[in-house]
A protein has these predicted regions:
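Domain-level signature for proteins that mediate thiol-based redox and metal-cofactor handling
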Residues: 1-164
Length: 164
């Protein structure tokens, strides 16, 4: 996933650059199988919808890659190697995130990425992206929804914290 908060940051994606060239677009987020476009308050969706859809269609029919290079999945994923029981715990956490939590969050235009698991404290660190990263209720979603589900299915989890 990739989250572009301004046109300058969008240089890694020709589609994001094109979307930011549309007056009123203020944010572009690419999820694993969706994209979210954010607009300024001063602009109305009725004027933005057609040029946004045209930019998306033009990009995907052109055959260009979504990102320059092979950086399609840049994001807060953990590079650590877990072993033994901890590897099983992390696999369970990632499975729950992928099958139950991420699809629900994607419906609101966001994504949650696994960052790391601290086996000593039982804390899971997650990275909220897209609409979720700026949403005022994201902390409540993280604590009430995600933390409760992970603690229920994976007893070794004691807490969930957001990373930036």
């Amino acid at each position: 996933t990739r989250d572009f908060r301004d046109a300058e940051a969008a240089a890694a994606s020709t589609l994001a650059v094109e979307l930011f060239s549309i007056e009123g677009v203020e944010r572009v987020f690419f999820g694993p199988d969706f994209l979210t476009v954010g607009k300024t308050r001063a602009h109305d969706w009725s004027h933005l919808k057609a040029p946004i859809l045209a930019a998306i269609m033009d990009h995907f029919t052109s055959g260009q890659p979504l990102f320059a290079g092979s950086d399609d999945a840049a994001g807060g994923h953990d590079d650590a190697v877990y072993e033994g029981e901890t590897a099983q715990i992390v696999a369970e956490i990632k499975d729950l995130l992928d099958t139950r939590i991420r699809p629900a969050v994607a419906q609101d235009g966001g994504d949650i990425l696994f960052n790391r698991f601290d086996e000593a404290t039982g804390v899971v660190y997650l990275n909220m992206r897209g609409a979720c990263s700026g949403c005022p209720s994201s902390s409540a979603t993280l604590k009430a929804g995600v933390e409760n589900m992970l603690k229920h299915y994976v007893p070794e989890v004691t807490a969930v914290e957001q990373t930036l």
